[in-house]
Amino acid sequence: MPSEIAVEKKKLKNPPLQLHYLGDRVLRQPAKRIAKVDDELRQLIRDMLQTMYSKDGIGLAAPQVGIHKQLIVIDLEPDNPANPPLVLINPTIKQVSKEICVAQEGCLSIPNVYMDVKRPEVVEIAYKDENGRPKTLKATDLLARCIQHEMDHLNGVVFVDRVDNSLTLAQELSKNGFSYQAVKPVA
């Protein structure tokens, strides 16, 4: 379900929140569940959305801006003002498909690095919206991929941890000023 939070989809020269990048320990720490959905949290959601739009992203998890909360914002159509964003509070994966899809991913925390990642094609999640209402969502295609990518951030995992081709990954990271030593491969 789309969010009711209203944020102008525009790029700001100085977004409200600072991104953290691969190699920063903050990205490796698991996020904590959110106990209370209130106006302070809704302001954080607005700030995260504005930061995401300012950086040309389609998804952002709170740990990427140094906040250890289980909070994700997603907008697959950032250029479409009529399409509201998706806000996921304390998301949990209920089910994933057996069908695996390989597609290229990028990340605001690892600028200019794009690599193929295998993920389940369909994912079903439970979460709370920005008003604290429990919701479920079955997602496919790009939305399923984006949800899984952002949920990884909540667990201290970044997409490069899931890349199979370590040689190409090391070259891409080095070319963009990142160290392969910051990668923590997951099975």
From Swiss-Prot:
Cofactor: Fe(2+)
Enzyme class: hydrolase
An MF annotation (GO) of this entry: metal ion binding
Binding residues annotated for Fe cation, in chain numbering: C107, H149, H153
Cofactor binding summary note: Binds 1 Fe(2+) ion.
Known catalytic reactions: N-terminal N-formyl-L-methionyl-[peptide] + H2O = N-terminal L-methionyl-[peptide] + formate
Keywords in alphabetical order: Hydrolase, Iron, Metal-binding, Protein biosynthesis
Active site: E150
CDD domains according to UniProt: Pep_deformylase
Pfam families on file: Pep_deformylase
EC numbers on record: 3.5.1.88
SUPFAM superfamilies: Peptide deformylase
Matching Gene3D superfamilies: Peptide deformylase
Any single biological process term in GO: translation
HAMAP family (alphabetical): Pep_deformylase
Family: Belongs to the polypeptide deformylase family.
Its job: Removes the formyl group from the N-terminal Met of newly synthesized proteins. Requires at least a dipeptide for an efficient rate of reaction. N-terminal L-methionine is a prerequisite for activity but the enzyme has broad specificity at other positions.
Name of the protein: Peptide deformylase
Organism of origin: Microchaete diplosiphon (Fremyella diplosiphon)
Lineage: Bacteria, Bacillati, Cyanobacteriota, Cyanophyceae, Nostocales
